[in-house]
Regions:
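Glycine-rich loops and low-complexity Gly/Arg-rich segments
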Residues: 29-32, 53-54
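Auxiliary, metal-adjacent structural segments of Zn-dependent hydrolase domains
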Residues: 1-27, 34-38
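Active-site recognition of the HExxH zinc-binding catalytic motif
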Residues: 42-54
Length: 54
């Protein structure tokens, strides 16, 4: 089961991506055709870092 978190604005960028964090802690990116895979992964890692801080 995947959980959609939210549309993520990239730092200093206007291209959004949709991230889902899976139950096993991995993540899935959706709607990333307009950005490079590396940037999408970075955006999700930033989101995951924020979530796990709390």
């Amino acid at each position: 089961m995947e959980y959609i978190i939210e549309r993520i604005p990239f730092p200093y960028d206007t291209i959004p991506a949709v991230a889902a964090i899976n139950k096993d802690g991995s993540y899935t990116i959706y709607e990333n055709a307009l950005c490079s895979e590396a940037r999408c992964e970075r955006a999700v890692r930033l989101l995951v870092d924020e979530i796990t801080k709390e």
